[in-house]
Amino acid sequence: MRGWLRHATVAFIALISLIPAASAENAKAHRSARLHRMVIQVDQNDSTVMNLALNNATNVIEYYRAKGQDVNVDVVAYGPGLNMLRADTSPVQDRIKNLKNYAFPSRIQFSACNVTKAGMEKKEGHPIDVLSEVVMVPSGVVRLMELQEKGWSYVRP
């Protein structure tokens, strides 16, 4: 019985000694699979700028897809750029719908500034609808700041 206990103890100690090595390998693999994140600013009511922003997003998604990696993209629209995400004025709404579906397994979000939306509603005198793919954020500029503070790469087409 003592022999069995001694062998079990030695096996247990040997097993425990492998844990730090496995943890180090996992940490190394995790670091090499870095999460890619990009935020794109759209603040102009210009279809050329809007299309360029969508081209940038598509190109980045395709680049990392070819490498077998995912990327998170957030297109933040505020000021006159909010027209990109309005249901009644967006010249790129079909591209937005298609890109939202195309991006998977990467992730793309379209963020609309609520400060801008409220200002437009007040000026126009009626509620404004945004595209169904849009997430409302309290402030577009604050969203840009917070994502950059978290390490997101910033692009302004």
Whereabouts are the PLM-identified features?
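Bacterial N-terminal signal peptides
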Residues: V10-L18
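Bacterial N-terminal signal peptides that target proteins for export
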Residues: M1-T9
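A subset of signal/propeptide-processing and intrinsically disordered low-complexity segments
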Residues: R2, P20-A21
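Secreted/extracellular ectodomain signature
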Residues: S23-P157
